[in-house]
Amino acid sequence: MRTHYCGDLRTTHLGETVTLYGWVDRRRDHGGVIFLDLRDRQGIVQIASSPDQTPASYPVAEGLRNEYVVQVTGVVSKRPPESLNEKIPTGEIEIYADSIILLNGVNQQLPFVVSSHEAEQVREDVRLKYRYLDLRRARLSQNLQLRHQVVKAMRRFLEDQENFLEIETPILTRSTPEGARDYLVPSRVNPGEWYALPQSPQLFKQLLMVAGMDRYYQIARCFRDEDLRADRQPEFTQLDMEMSFMGQEEILDLNEALICHIFKVVKNIDLPRPFPRLTYQESMAKYGNDRPDTRFGLELVDVSDLLGNTGFKVFSAAVSSGGSIKAIRVPGGNETISNVRIKPGGDLFKEATEAGAKGIAYIRVRDNGEIDTIGAIKENLDEAQVKTLLQLTQAEAGDLLLFGAGDTATVDKSLSRLRLVLGEQLGLIDPDAINLLWITDFPMFEWNSDEKRFEALHHPFTAPHPDDLGDLKTARAQAYDLVMNGVEIGGGSLRIYQREVQEKVFATIGLSPEEAHEKFGFLLDAFEYGTPPHGGIAYGLDRLVMLLAKEDSIRDVIAFPKTQQASCLLTEAPAAVDKKQLKELSVASTYVPKVKVDD
């Protein structure tokens, strides 16, 4: 029986006889003494075997190779001074193996080197195809253990300190297409009818509040059939919470305590409280988006009033058509950013135009306080306007001002993108900083120009601000998102709990009373039976762990992720199914495979 994990052994175990299990990470033959690095999920420890000291294990050690699975029994010994290894936690000790038992070998050539001693860069598609080998590597193994620690900390806080109940909600539910596409599951028992996999437990957790389960949480699996990005998966995990009889301030306070608990337990980091807050409007005005990275400056400054009446047509046309002009001050930008990068063909120009802008205007501030720019701008700015512009942007000699002009949404999107790119390129972002903040007071709705109707910005169960009930189309939502270093890690809201308000919201997004009853009648009916005030939040577990692990993709904190084409390279899912299975489900496929034509 195993007595210890490899990575847990220290000098405090000297003289103990231990039994370890693991994989051979590396084998070295040093003139009659064979050294093995034995690896398990906790780390690596050195095993030694020689014909003189450990004659029983030596013949087995001679035949071992990388990734063989073995059992080792031996005595923990102190390493000689010349072989100490400060790079690993077990570097002061080694195990002289009285016994080595080969449990399994490797019968195929390894697709890549698993050993932590090799720095081989492996293509992600190969890693995903052989994910069971990839997960043996220290980085991925540590990420999954970190994920476990985060979930454990969540559970302990919510259950032991805050009296929450963990309650499971259905995976097979009904389709309520609002937002992302559902994954559909045909019913064999009810031909022609379909289940949907849940995009979130939203409706069920609200019904649990109606049922009196006043503090609910769940580590929930969610499914969305949407176009994928680096931080999206078709199936993902969230910490889902709902609370009755709590206002927004109480919910935010509890969640700040939860996040602080997670960081303290998992990373031994004390986060300052309370977390800063910005309204949605403030965030858009200063950063151009609703998930700002506040670890650095380069904030947007609105200069529409100052520059909208100049003779420079790009600026005046933007303001006269209802748009805006905004600027970013880049300290020392005269030295760090050339004109070539700003003009057509440059990398910054490309970033801006990919975000929808037609180009970038710029002004360079010289040592004498004068400006240097393209003639059309300079010719249309008088001395007083230049002075006011420098005051508004706090620009100094040597600084560069970058401008966006046009419809406000495009200006915000393009300058927000430039801001992030410049923050990275200029080294303004502290990779170890942790900046958390709440974004509040979102709009209830946004206009879908394609479908010519309003859509809920979050979801249609979010409660409108009580001061804005007169005209819901312009109402603020009692919604809140938690943002960490420019990534939204959680979002929630107070919920509607009165039938008449919920019906009014459904009508605003274009649902007729009949459609609302057909899709959500069970919820509306529940509101007739004494529904308490309630609210909640959901955290993207994958994103949170990604940030804690300092990874760039959530695929590196998920055991078996899908690709950006929503496929599993390991199991080759999705895959075709037998026609007999489809017939049992009363389903027929209309897909016609494309015929490959040889050149």
Curated annotation (Swiss-Prot):
Region annotated Aspartate, chain positions: 202-205
Coarse class of the protein's main subcellular location: cytoplasm
Coiled coil regions in record: none
Keyword entries, A-Z: Aminoacyl-tRNA synthetase, ATP-binding, Cytoplasm, Ligase, Nucleotide-binding, Protein biosynthesis
GO CC terms: cytoplasm
Enzyme class, broadest EC rank: ligase
Residues that hold ATP according to the record: R224, D225, E226, Q233, E488, G540, L541, D542, R543
Binding site residues for L-aspartate: E178, R224, H458, R495
Keyword Nucleotide-binding: yes
A Pfam family annotated for this UniProt entry: GAD
Subcellular localization(s) per the UniProt record: Cytoplasm
Cysteine pairings via disulfide bonds: none
Similarity field: Belongs to the class-II aminoacyl-tRNA synthetase family. Type 1 subfamily.
Stated role: Aspartyl-tRNA synthetase with relaxed tRNA specificity since it is able to aspartylate not only its cognate tRNA(Asp) but also tRNA(Asn). Reaction proceeds in two steps: L-aspartate is first activated by ATP to form Asp-AMP and then transferred to the acceptor end of tRNA(Asp/Asn).
Name of the protein: Aspartate--tRNA(Asp/Asn) ligase
Biological source species: Synechocystis sp. (strain ATCC 27184 / PCC 6803 / Kazusa)
Gene name of the encoded protein: aspS
